[in-house]
């Protein structure tokens, strides 16, 4: 049976049109994975659930979720490393998109959402600096969302771990102290932001990376800082 029909038949939507709209808005899970095609065939025994209007455990999840609405990255059956996992926003989205397992690394402790921490697909490494992290695991994709440190400082540590990367570039930690900021620490110097982004892009190229996408995050940082997703892989 089609997913939109199943939603209507199970009284999860008031009409087939509303059921279709829910699917297209990525608000429907089948067996814990987001399905975005109304014509997806549901089998007997499949578990269908609706996602709340804001299902994310953190702002990071909102950022990545919004990015992936316009930029496809294949997570299905992949082993993902989440660097700077914190509450687990990126990890949550990875699982919703079909990741097989997610390794969560963060220098902090007791931050990861309890629901994620209890998920068997999650491996939690607390009080762990990525620069000292080692694993025999083959990592298919590295997600990176770190604060209070430049991406330059950890790039050499994450490069050997995988061949594909999606990093959140945060100008507030990249432009240096001389850049003009407001009282909340938001960088106001647009030229400094663009220069810092260009410099990092050029740095990746010197390291023989192919840049697939650079996109301003549709969801800004907590205090209003502009941030950028950079998707890159080994050339």
Segments from the language model and where they lie:
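A basic, amphipathic helix-loop patch mediating RNA/tRNA/ribosome contacts
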Residues: 1-46, 79
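Conserved class I S-adenosyl-L-methionine
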Residues: 76-86
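Conserved SAM-binding loop of SAM-dependent methyltransferases across substrates and taxa
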Residues: 87-98
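S-adenosyl-L-methionine
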Residues: 103-151
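A short glycine-rich, Lys/Arg-flanked "PGG" loop and its adjoining helix->strand segment in the class I
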Residues: 152-166
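Conserved beta-strand signature within the Rossmann-like core of class I S-adenosyl-L-methionine
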Residues: 162-176
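C-terminal substrate-binding/active-site "lid" region of AdoMet-derived donor-dependent transferases
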Residues: 172-215
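Core SAM-dependent methyltransferase catalytic element
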Residues: 216-235
């Amino acid at each position: 049976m089609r997913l939109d029909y199943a939603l209507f038949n199970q009284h999860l939507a008031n009409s087939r049109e509303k059921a279709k709209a829910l699917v297209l808005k990525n608000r429907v899970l089948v067996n814990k994975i987001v399905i975005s095609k109304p014509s997806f065939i549901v089998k007997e025994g499949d578990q269908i659930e609706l996602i709340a209007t804001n299902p994310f455990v953190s702002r990071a999840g909102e950022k990545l979720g919004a990015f992936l609405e316009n930029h496809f990255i294949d997570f299905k059956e992949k082993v993902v490393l989440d660097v700077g996992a914190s509450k687990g926003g990126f990890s949550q989205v990875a699982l919703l998109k079909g990741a097989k397992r997610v390794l969560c690394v963060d220098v902090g402790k007791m931050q990861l959402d309890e629901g994620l921490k209890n998920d068997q697909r999650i491996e939690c490494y607390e009080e762990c600096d990525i620069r000292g992290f080692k694993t025999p695991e083959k990592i298919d994709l590295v997600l990176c969302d770190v604060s209070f440190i430049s991406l330059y400082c950890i790039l050499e540590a994450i490069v050997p771990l995988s061949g594909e990367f999606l990093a959140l570039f945060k100008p507030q930690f990249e432009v240096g102290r001389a850049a003009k900021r407001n009282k909340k620490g938001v960088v106001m110097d647009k030229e400094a932001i663009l220069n810092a982004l260009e410099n990092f892009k050029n740095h990746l190229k010197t390291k023989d990376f192919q840049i697939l996408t650079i996109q301003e995050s549709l969801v800004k940082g907590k205090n209003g800082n502009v941030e950028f997703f950079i998707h890159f892989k080994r050339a």
